[in-house]
Amino acid sequence: MPVNYHQIESRLPEYGKRMKEFETALAQAEPALWEQFTRLDEDVAALRAKIEKAEAQLRRLYCAKPVSEPLLTHKAAPLPPAGYTLIAADGSQIVPNRHRPVQFGVINVGLIQARLGSGTAPEVSIQSTLLDPEELLNPEGNLIGEDEVALYRDFAERRALLEAALAAQAPVIALTDGLLDIYQQYSAPQLNFQADMRKIHQQLEARGVISAGYVDKPGAEMLSRMLDLLHTPETDLIAYDDQKRSLRGISDARLLAKLLTVPGERSAVFETVSKGAAQTSLKVHFYYINISLGNTPYLARVEFPAWQIGRASCRERV
């Protein structure tokens, strides 16, 4: 069905006006949010205690939790080792469609593997898999959709990374394009990959593989969620609903761009708190890093397993 461009065009002036008002409101709210963030710089223990109390009381919560560094930490990212194996995975998929005469689904996983410092060319491989016929239907007998196929793809990426990492020369850094872990959604309860994901993470940990997820256009608002929770009276915690928070639209990257002004600098390390619709098999930490090559900050988010903090050999390479 084609778009009614005339109808859209007639609404553009009003839409532009409302969007400008929205952006103005965000710009006015941002200094107050930054002031809250800076004021809590050294209160890491108190912040953790408040968030952990909320975790114990709430069924649903999604926010950042500081680990140990002050909130205003900004430091140069560690240098990579002289020689290491870098493995990165990215995937794509074809979703079943009831308008096709034959139903099928395809999972595509691309791997690039490079031995840095060796002088050899990177190796590229592609693994393409058809979903089995029984995998195309959900428990109700309907065709699976984008969410379910994305879970199959995400799991295939992690499995391919594990297989490549176990055969690679150490030290190994394994990168996922996007979030580090698979978040099990209620929309696809039949695809419970959590047990298998735990096994993958355990094998990577036993091998000492430095695994990380790289998000190059982060839009998460985990820090503003954290600040909103912290300013909720403890007597009101039991009824707290982060979906009803008053301030939305200021991402972590937008907030921290004031702090990470030098290319190569990273932020403090935070822990991902996730309870509710998005279930995870892994305790994930993350930081933001300025990857800009110029004067304007461009922030990416790097996620990694919490266990890497406890190993000096891994901690200095994350």
Task: Identify what each model region corresponds to.
Residues 92-95, 181:
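A short acidic, glycine/proline-enriched capping/turn motif at secondary-structure boundaries
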Residues 1-79, 84, 146-173, 178-317:
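Long, contiguous domain-sized segments
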Residues 125-148, 152-155, 161:
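Glycine-rich oxoanion-binding loops at beta->alpha junctions
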Residues 86-89:
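Short hydrophobic beta-strand that contains or immediately precedes a catalytic carboxylate
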Residues 94-139:
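Acidic, metal-ligating active-site segments
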